[in-house]
Design a protein with these regions (language model features):
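N-terminal leader/linker segments that initiate helical-solenoid repeat arrays
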Residues: 23-63
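Conserved structural position within tetratricopeptide repeats
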Residues: 53-56, 60, 91-94, 125-128, ...
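Terminal, low-structured helical/coil segments at or just beyond the last alpha-helical repeat
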Residues: 30-35, 587, 595-627
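Conserved alpha-helical positions within TPR/SEL1-like repeat arrays
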Residues: 67-77, 101-111, 135-145, 169-176, ...
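Short coil turns that delineate tetratricopeptide repeat
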Residues: 63, 97, 131, 165, ...
Length: 627
């Protein structure tokens, strides 16, 4: 946003009586005085020249010599020679320690140089010397505002307004201070007054729009930006800000048009590039987003947010190294911003580096203990480490901070379900859906929990709703599996066909469709699906086990034995694979081998009836300790 700058005024020379000065010299001095003090419209160079002639003439004493140095300082500052201006202001106050205007203008210059403490010291002196200088109060208010001491800045703006009730710039700057303090209502009142005093103040209209935006009233914000642009059709900040309001309303087309116009008017407008990049990011056009973020950091290398945004685009594009590099730079530039640690933590978690992810998310929480999202993400990192004892308390804290945090309820439900507590899981999925009735993932996960409880009808009902909201391959796959468990292989195959259509690389869907075909005794077709699953996932023990079972049912003992061997090699804790191999060996009259396999299956799963029945047939006892 724009801050109005205080325009410095030149001091007037006192009437001079110069002993011994000739008429011609006096006339020449008068010309230079008019030029030096700004009474005539001249260039800064002409003004500096005239001031220098008078200063070097030796004909002036304090306080008039102080005025000449002050006015030359004004011209030097206007030319951008801040060091020269500072030297002249210093000489002015040395020559005349009661020269309030010189202290005020040196304070203003020091403020421009961000030398805030010395600026305030000068302005304190200026105000002590002239307590009616509204401009000095205004400038000191600006200095306190830059120090983020908003109460003092507002007090100074109050005094400036008391001294000059029509001082529009003071209302404008007090509005800025109230906004930065988070007092949006008082900020709007001040902008109202600034606009009343100057209805064509595009900056005040723009800034009032920003406050409406921050209050969440996007329509009023847009109305103010529209009015600012009617006043000044080339005001790039208003286009940028209106674009942000359109983006917040979900109108990406209008947002892009406004950001385009802002950049056209101001080709190095880093913030507009950053904001346009965010629109492209939301549209998942990561290449365009990254190009805009590139421009944002090129034109503003200190913009930590733009580095963070570019990191997000790289991360979602799958380029974790580039993402982490950007987050590193964002953290270097803004090490107290919890969001950058949070984003880097997510990238590291996605890369499987759970310990470093947890460290980053912990730092985010140290910086911002109220960051519910960071608790949720750290909980998810613990969950992926199968550390449910740490995951669940983090989800608890996320929910405590945000009782409507649907994702945290869903994630805690997953942890409970994986712990074997489907009832608690279902309770959490219910809460997630209460917070967000269109949350397809919570319906999908609740369906899994119902399946774990053996309630296939409720599982199918949840998958139905999940598919209506978001028809994913996983939802079709799980519903197909549920139909199969309900004894409806035809409906299962229809769902699994759709799952494979949506995700042709889903080994699970091929395995489940193979199982459905096997139930129909279409063993060759089933084995074709299992084979495809193995091609997609060569270490899928479940695919080998199921193909072994299909071969066994088809009487293909050699093939069944080979697949059972491979399933066991990939998963030594598969009771089903041992039991199947035991059946094949029993059929091949390898009773010793069959007994060994049945015993191993029972050792893994003592409740498994199939190997127990095999041992009974072979009149063999289970292994010691297996029951």
């Amino acid at each position: 946003m724009t801050r109005l700058q205080l325009a410095s005024c030149s001091a007037a020379l006192a009437t001079l009586v110069l002993a011994g000065a000739g008429t011609t010299a006096r006339a020449q001095d008068a010309v230079h005085e008019h030029r030096c003090t700004g009474q005539w419209r001249v260039t800064n160079d002409e003004r500096i020249t005239s001031c220098t002639v008078l200063i070097d003439s030796g004909r002036y004493q304090a306080p008039n010599l102080a005025i000449l140095h002050h006015d030359r300082g004004i011209a030097l500052r206007a030319k951008g020679d801040l060091a020269g201006a500072l030297t002249d202001f210093a000489e002015a106050v040395r020559l005349d320690p009661d020269f309030a205007r010189a202290f005020a203008d040196r304070g203003s210059l020091r403020l421009a140089q961000h030398d805030l403490d010395n600026a305030i010291a000068d302005l304190d002196t200026a105000i002590r010397l002239d307590a009616n200088d509204a401009g000095a109060f205004m400038t000191r208010g600006n200095a306190y505002d830059e120090k983020t001491d908003f109460d003092r800045s507002i007090a100074d703006y109050n005094e400036a307004i008391r001294l000059s009730p029509t001082y529009g710039a003071a209302f404008f700057n007090r509005g800025l201070a109230f906004r930065r303090k988070g007092d949006f209502d008082h900020a709007i009142t001040d902008y109202d007054q600034a606009i009343k005093l100057d209805p064509k103040n595009a900056s005040a209209l723009n800034n009032r729009g920003v406050v409406w935006f921050e209050k969440g009233d996007f329509d009023r914000a847009i109305a103010d930006y529209n009015q600012a642009l009617r006043v000044d059709g080339n005001f790039a900040p208003a286009y940028n800000n209106r674009g942000e309001a359109w983006r917040a309303k979900g109108d990406t087309a209008r947002a892009l048009a406004d950001f385009d116009r802002a950049i056209q008017l101001s080709p190095q407008f880093a913030l507009a590039f950053d904001n346009r990049g965010l629109v492209h990011y939301q549209k998942r056009d990561y290449d365009r987003a990254i190009a805009d973020f590139d421009a944002a950091v090129r034109f503003d290398p200190g913009n930590a947010a733009a580095y963070g945004n570019r990191g997000n685009a790289h991360d979602d594009k799958g380029d974790r190294n580039a993402a982490v590099a950007d987050y590193n730079e964002a953290i270097r530039l803004d090490p107290k911003n919890a969001r950058h640690f949070y984003d880097r933590g997510i990238a590291l978690r996605r890369d499987g580096d759970f310990d470093r992810a947890i460290a980053d998310l912990s730092e985010a929480l140290r910086l911002n203990p109220q960051f519910a999202g960071a608790y949720n993400e750290r909980g998810y990192a613990f969950y992926q480490k199968h550390d449910f004892a740490r995951a669940i308390p983090d989800y608890d804290e996320a929910i405590k901070l945000n009782p409507k945090f649907a994702i945290a309820y869903n994630n805690r439900g997953n942890a409970f379900d994986d712990k074997g507590e489907p009832d608690r899981a279902i309770a959490d999925y219910n809460e997630a859906l209460r917070a967000d009735p269109s949350y397809a993932a919570a319906l999908y996960n609740r369906g899994i929990a119902w399946r774990h409880k053996g309630d296939l009808d409720r599982a199918v009902a949840d998958y139905d709703q999940a598919i209506k909201l978001n028809p994913t391959a996983a939802a079709y796959n799980n519903r197909g599996s549920a139909w199969l468990a309900k004894g409806e292989p035809e409906r299962a195959i229809a769902d699994l066909d759709q799952a494979i259509k949506l995700d042709p690389r889903s080994a699970d869907a091929y395995i489940n469709r193979g199982n459905a075909k096997r139930e129909r005794q279409a063993f060759a077709d089933a084995n074709a699906d299992y084979t495809h699953a193995i091609e997609l996932s060569p270490n899928a023990a479940l695919a080998y086990y199921n193909r072994a079972w299909a071969h066994y049912l088809a009487g293909e003992n050699v093939e069944a034995l080979a697949d059972a061997d491979r399933a066991i090699a990939l998963n030594e804790r598969s009771a089903s694979a041992y039991s199947t191999r035991g059946l094949v060996r029993e059929r091949l009259a390898d009773n010793a081998g069959a007994i060994a396999d049945f015993r191993k299956a029972l050792e893994i799963d003592p409740s498994f009836r199939q190997p127990a029945e095999g041992l009974q047939r072979l009149k063999a006892a289970p292994a010691a300790g297996s029951r």
